[in-house]
């Protein structure tokens, strides 16, 4: 089941916008119908860059969950929870920090990138340096097999894999490991045991990944061995020991090209967003203020859509016939910029009107939201507690 478990989260540092909707939430909607999905509000992570800001986290957390529900995240098939409601995240983060080399954290690309991007903030903190390790703990504590990320986040998943590999190497070599592994093999039956031994030998002698995949699949099919035996034999294939914290895989998602009001990527940091909660009047005002091709000083001046931020929004929201109409009208000066912007205003309102209707419904029932958070957090914590029992036992602190 763990290889079918997906985990993803968001920091509650402000209102969700169309960039979140197109870049993350639409992916979540597809994933929740295919995987065992865990979606969490990463409230501790909010402090990594906003530790000195007076942000109303309680409001942001509640509004974030309301917005998730309004776009269609279903608590009946997805586990929705809040990071701080599962304190085991912090415990695993602490224990992993004992064996994670400092250089691993310093080389994460986003460490220096974010320092440059947010140069008005003092990010020379232990929390900011260590936040990728907290992300690793977030993932590993649920033994999530898949983490949906864009290409810019793959390095974080690679770090998580290295952290898990190191932990398993240090603490997975239990006393009499080989003897216990051989006993587990004998429980598989002669034919299956022979296949396992053959695949293990092939992998260890040649490094054949196909043999590793087949051996892992063989273990998943076994009914006569315990979960502990399965994890032990999984590590025995690779010669590392019992797999306590499985290594996750990146689930690459299609990058959102959602542009902001100024043509840059839509981001709160750039102040160029359209919120999921913006009124029709606010949407119209924001779109109408958007800059256009500077060559179009007068209505009779021809323009170039490729030099206009508005065109980027047409590529997201407009069909081919509308896009053709825009190109024709702009390049031949047959329409003004106000006229060009109207289809975008209409399209955004069409998307947001039903979402905002559902936001109003959920907002009117705060007790329901609290109950969803409570139940999801309790479910998540029960999984996290099981992982921490294994971790403490492996590290010898289960007294």
Annotate each language-model stretch with its function:
Residues 82, 150, 277:
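Active-site-adjacent beta-strand anchor residues
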Residues 2-7, 12-137, 158, 162-164, ...:
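N-terminal Rossmann-like or analogous alpha/beta NTP/dinucleotide-binding catalytic cores
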Residues 78-80, 143, 248-250:
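A short coil-to-beta-strand element that immediately follows conserved catalytic motifs
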Residues 115-121, 143-154, 272-274:
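Flexible, glycine/proline-enriched loop segments at strand-loop-helix junctions
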Residues 18, 155, 161-399:
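Conserved nucleotide- and phosphate/pyrophosphate-binding catalytic cores
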Residues 57, 126, 149, 153, ...:
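Aromatic-acidic/polar surface patches that form glycan- and anion
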């Amino acid at each position: 089941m763990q290889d079918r478990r997906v985990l993803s989260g968001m920091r509650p540092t402000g209102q969700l916008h169309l960039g979140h909707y197109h870049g993350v939430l639409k992916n979540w909607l597809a994933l929740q119908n295919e995987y065992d999905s865990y979606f969490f509000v990463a409230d501790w992570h909010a402090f990594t860059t906003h530790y000195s800001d007076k942000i109303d986290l309680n409001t942001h957390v509640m509004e974030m969950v309301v917005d998730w529900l309004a776009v269609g995240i279903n608590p009946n098939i997805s586990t929705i929870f809040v990071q701080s409601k599962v304190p085991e995240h912090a415990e695993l983060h602490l224990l992993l920090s004992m064996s994670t080399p400092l250089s691993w954290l310093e080389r994460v690309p986003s460490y220096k990138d974010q320092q440059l991007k947010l140069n008005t903030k003092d990010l020379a903190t232990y929390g900011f340096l260590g936040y990728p390790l907290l992300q690793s703990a977030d993932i590993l504590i649920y033994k999530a097999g898949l983490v949906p990320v864009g290409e810019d986040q793959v390095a974080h998943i690679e770090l998580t894999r290295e952290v898990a590999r190191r932990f398993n190497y240090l603490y997975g070599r239990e006393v009499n490991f080989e003897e216990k592994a051989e006993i587990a093999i004998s429980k598989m039956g002669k034919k299956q045991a022979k296949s396992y031994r053959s695949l293990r030998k092939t992998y260890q002698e040649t490094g054949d990944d196909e043999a590793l995949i087949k051996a892992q699949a063989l273990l998943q099919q076994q009914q006569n061995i315990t979960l502990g035996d399965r994890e032990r034999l999984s590590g025995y294939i690779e010669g590392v020991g019992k797999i306590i914290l499985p290594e996750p895989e990146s689930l690459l998602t299609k990058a959102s090209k959602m542009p902001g009001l100024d043509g840059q990527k839509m981001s709160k940091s750039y102040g160029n967003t359209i919120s999921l909660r913006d009124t029709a009047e606010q949407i119209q005002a924001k779109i109408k203020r958007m800059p256009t091709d500077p060559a179009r000083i007068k209505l009779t001046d021809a323009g170039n859509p490729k030099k206009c931020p508005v065109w980027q929004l047409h590529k997201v929201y407009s069909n081919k016939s509308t896009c053709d109409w825009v190109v024709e009208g702009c390049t031949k000066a047959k329409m003004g910029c106000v006229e060009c912007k109207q289809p975008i205003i209409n399209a955004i309102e069409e998307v947001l009107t039903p979402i905002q209707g559902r936001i109003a419904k959920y907002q009117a029932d705060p007790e329901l939201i609290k109950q969803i958070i409570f139940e999801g957090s309790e479910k998540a914590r029960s999984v996290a507690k099981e992982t921490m029992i294994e971790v403490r036992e492996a590290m010898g602190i289960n007294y």
